[in-house]
Amino acid sequence: MIKLKSYFGEFGGMYVPQILIPALTQLEEAFISAQDDAIFQKELKYLLNNYAGRPTPLTLCRNLTKGTRAKLYLKREDLLHGGSHKTNQVLGQALLAKRMSKTEIIAETGAGQHGVAVSIAASLLGLKCRIYMGSKDIKRQKLNVLRMQLMGTQVIPVHRGSETLKDACNEAMREWSKTYEYTHYMLGTAAGPHPFPTIVREFQRIIGKETYKQIQKYEQCLPDAIIACVGGGSNAIGIFSDFVDIPSVQLLGVEAGGLGINTEYHGAALQHGSIGIYFGMKTSILQSSEGQVKNSYSVSAGLDFPSVGPEHVYLKNTGRVQYVSINDIEAITAFKKLSIHEGIIPALESAHALAHALKIIQKQPDKAQILVVNLSGRGDKDISTVHNALQKERDK
């Protein structure tokens, strides 16, 4: 059988206990066979179009760029059913789970967006669902926890370590190693052991495909730059994929600068990490000189992750994608600006990408340029977080 490439340059691989190799091999084989299965592809397309709501619009921000020569477009993944880009790939993985005769789904979630998306797919396709979530994230994402529970999902709090996404990932992987015969581990980002980074990228590729067609329809040309936030990296790799081979389009990934990348409180694994083995892959990790994984930090739960998908490390090393960071205050400011001027409340994760786009425009307001920001999710889940952060600023 044809095999997928398990490495991106030197990054990626399958660094897992021997017991999980058969499950990962089965998943790879199911994915490869599904690519040539017209019935599978027809079902996935039907669900994406008629259930999830694809294609999503490409929206021009007329107010935010007033007084400049720039055009700023938003790829509106926030309008997808479930509220974020996560729905794209969970529908694909859920169909793969059915194809492999699995009866249960287990997954991890940080911001809760992936957990909600998994719950949607499991509910739709009649699969049992368990979601592991750091207890800190449960507190800051109560709305998404309730949404998951409403759909019949068992949300399991993780009290280990920093009680955030990395600990939820570890716990979900641990559980999968015990139950893989009847469960499918639905990883939420383009990271982890092979074949997950490739599978997730391919299911998220629809974002870039649509953007490519839409921007040419509206502008009769390609954009100058595409900007996306990067935690694990699935929304970014999804929109980047159809533009990677077009050097005229600048690709910009935006990491969580937290309280500042010169502090210990950030999530910038690409800019300040070092190479190691983590979560079943060779990648860039925030780690100590002794190899201990450090705690990451971000005001946005979805970017609060100490590592990143291996393809992003490869794209950074080859120079094809430039990675920058935006701090909490800049992200919250962009969150407010989009809400006030365009009537769109973005996820805090997406607000990091928006903040960098606004920086580019502010630096050269007289430059005629076309920027596309992947608005990966909506911000309902973040309203109380932003409210609390603004309250703290006022109380200083």
Curated annotation (Swiss-Prot):
A GO CC annotation given for this chain: cytoplasm
Catalytic activity: (1S,2R)-1-C-(indol-3-yl)glycerol 3-phosphate + L-serine = D-glyceraldehyde 3-phosphate + L-tryptophan + H2O
Transmembrane segments: none
Cofactor(s) listed: pyridoxal 5'-phosphate
Positions bearing N6-(pyridoxal phosphate)lysine: 86
Keywords: Amino-acid biosynthesis, Aromatic amino acid biosynthesis, Lyase, Pyridoxal phosphate, Tryptophan biosynthesis
GO MF annotation list: tryptophan synthase activity
Keyword Lyase: yes
Enzyme class: lyase
Keyword Phosphoprotein attributed: no
Record InterPro entries: Trp_synth_b_CS (IPR006653), Trp_synth_beta (IPR006654), Trp_synth_beta/beta-like (IPR023026), TrpB-like_PALP (IPR001926), TrpB-like_PALP_sf (IPR036052)
Pathway: Amino-acid biosynthesis; L-tryptophan biosynthesis; L-tryptophan from chorismate: step 5/5
UniProt EC number: 4.2.1.20
Function: The beta subunit is responsible for the synthesis of L-tryptophan from indole and L-serine.
Family assignment from sequence similarity: Belongs to the TrpB family.
Complexes and interactors: Tetramer of two alpha and two beta chains.
Record-given protein name: Tryptophan synthase beta chain
